[in-house]
Amino acid sequence: MEILTLGSRGPAVKLIQSLLIRIGYNPGPVDGIFGQVTREAVREFQLDNGLEPDGVVGPATWSRFERFLIGYDTYTIRQGDTLYNISRKYYTSLNAVMTANPGIDPGNLRVGQVITVPYGIDVVFTDIDYTYEIMDRDIRGLKARYPFIQVGIAGRSVLGKNLYYIKLGNGPSEVFYNGAHHALEWITAPLLMKFIENYARGYARNSSIQGYNIRDLWNRGSIYIMPMVNPDGVDLVLEGLKRDNPYYNRLIAWNDTGLPFSQVWNANIRGVDLNRNYPASWMEAKAQEPSLGVDGPGPTRYGGQSPLSEPETQTVANFTRKHNF
């Protein structure tokens, strides 16, 4: 992660501001601006955690933040420990510790045994700019808290980012949800990720959502979720165009709108609108392009040279063919 200091801006700043609020500090509003109030909150966190209180989020502070961001810690059992006392020490619940450690026997803890201890805060934050890196961390955090969820990689984006899927349930009826086909619509990714967290927690607690018992749904159906189909485009919108992007010069040429990527870019990193790159009605959509002022790669509505020309749409199409959605 980048080093954050006074004057820094962007998604990483929002992330630490949101985290600091959740763990009892006051960084000011979650606005992505590293001002004096945020700096002071960072200093207080550093003092409380034995770090140099310089108000700079460098490698050591990021490392300490990382434990909270991924949502759990590992703990080595000592003589006299009980799961109840461990859960109280970490401000979490006994149920959360038991869920994260399937098969553990509370009455037969072994000295030296390493367990996973979830923190008492949610993994998925919904008040931040939701980049691929944040989603990747959240998936790992959710898998640690809820080992019964299934996580897989269906494919990779143009730039090699994983196209994750998460499976919830074991029933015969299969349902598929996906998000962030369009880069500007990145908010659908944290929506789905928060659903995953709530659904998994409901299963662990044997509770209901809107009157539906989650364990009953779990046994009746299987929900497959691909939360971010277009991670390259999402990061372009949220983090801006970086010099080391292999499409740097082409992206500048393709975005001929005069507006920043954060306001106009829906396509993948090769300027293809993924929603218009599927075989269904591809020819009809292609015929519309001239009237829309589209003559090649760009921010939106270019369907590519052929159906499924992009690795992201190939991944989604192949995934659906393997299931009975």
Regions picked out by a protein language model, each given a short descriptive name:
Residues 42, 97:
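Conserved hydrophobic/aromatic packing and binding residues within compact polymer-binding modules
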Residues 20-29, 43-52:
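Extended, structured, electrostatic nucleic-acid-contact surfaces
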Residues 53-69:
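Alpha-helical interaction/regulatory segments in DNA maintenance proteins
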Residues 3, 96, 118-159:
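Short glycine- and acidic-rich boundary segments immediately preceding or forming the N-terminal edge
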Residues 164-173, 180:
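Short beta-strand-to-loop junctions in surface cap/lid or active-site-entrance loops
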Residues 8-18, 31-36, 67-91, 113, ...:
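Primarily a LysM-type cell-wall glycan-binding module
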Residues 172, 186-325:
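Active-site/substrate-binding loop(s) of hydrolase catalytic cores
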